């Protein structure tokens, strides 16, 4: 008797969670990894700097290197760490590349960005740890473990896409690379601004001992 309500809740959750198939595709990328072959030479972690600029197809065609990008929008450095731990359960790549620019961000920006990284992870101790480190004050752990708690009111926003992809969403990337029509190769590099003068805080201001 208990199983019937549980099944109904599960079906409802599958229907109500966002599918990210045609809009905000970044939200589908983390989950896609689990359907890929687990034999990559290189694993790449980070945000749009990696998943819009590094092409696993080009790496394979030109150098014979198999790679996968576990990228997501505004991916934080600790999220990259737990994604790495999660990935190492499935394979052992020879090289791991991490976008260290994320180290400049100390706090999560919003629930929306958190969701695009965390919702797609399979439930594990690494997902729970990443949730704990990422949550804003308004968020709670239960809504990540049971997404229905977060998306139960989304019924009024449902579209045909939610029904079509209730069980399986189409791939939006190629090995984690998200093709964006608006992204173009750099043709000119603007002149960099002059660096600030850090003389006052450098070692040159120290009074060094002199030989008497």
Locate the predicted segments by residue.
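Short, flexible loop segments at the rims of nucleotide/cofactor-binding pockets, characterized by
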Residues: 18-24, 45-46, 72-76
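Hydrophobic membrane-insertion alpha-helices, especially the h-region
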Residues: 1-17
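Alpha-helical transmembrane signal-anchor/signal-peptide segments
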Residues: 19-35
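Secreted/periplasmic serine-hydrolase-like ester/acetyl group-modifying domain
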Residues: 113-206
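Mature, folded catalytic cores of secreted/periplasmic enzymes
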Residues: 61, 95, 200-202, 212
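Membrane-embedded segments
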Residues: 49-130
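A short, hydrophobic C-terminal helix/tail in secreted or cell-surface proteins
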Residues: 207-211
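Short extracytoplasmic
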Residues: 34-58
